[in-house]
Amino acid sequence: MAVTQEEIIAGIAEIIEEVTGIEPSEITPEKSFVDDLDIDSLSMVEIAVQTEDKYGVKIPDEDLAGLRTVGDVVTYIQKLEEENPEAAEALRAKIVSENPEAAANVQARLETESK
């Protein structure tokens, strides 16, 4: 099973909180890094580096420039997972073991928002 959207959002929210101090509850897929979260370019690079480390992916600079929202990053990571399903399963196990509470909180919030 691939990493779920909720698990990726939880992981990205954790990274954003570490880099910027923004509360994970404020981070949703539609939020723009610049317009909504007020993240500057230096912080965005740090978020990208930590995302690469956490998810075992490489985000080229030209791709990073096109990732404008949290949802864009989620979609990008999911696309990379589809290209390498074995790595995605190992990644899912790692994320859930490191962030079970965060993953559960994001899942609950998304379920509430969709009602």
UniProtKB/Swiss-Prot annotation:
One of its GO terms (biological process) is lipid A biosynthetic process. It comes from Mycobacterium leprae (strain TN). 4'-phosphopantetheine is transferred from CoA to a specific serine of apo-AcpM. It is found in: Cytoplasm. GO terms for cellular component: cytosol; membrane. Keywords: Cytoplasm, Fatty acid biosynthesis, Fatty acid metabolism, Lipid biosynthesis, Lipid metabolism, Phosphopantetheine, Phosphoprotein. HAMAP family: Acyl_carrier (MF_01217). Acyl carrier protein involved in meromycolate extension. Belongs to the acyl carrier protein (ACP) family. One of its GO terms (molecular function) is acyl binding. This is Meromycolate extension acyl carrier protein. The modification O-(pantetheine 4'-phosphoryl)serine is found at residue 41. Residues 3-81 form the Carrier domain. Pfam families: PP-binding.
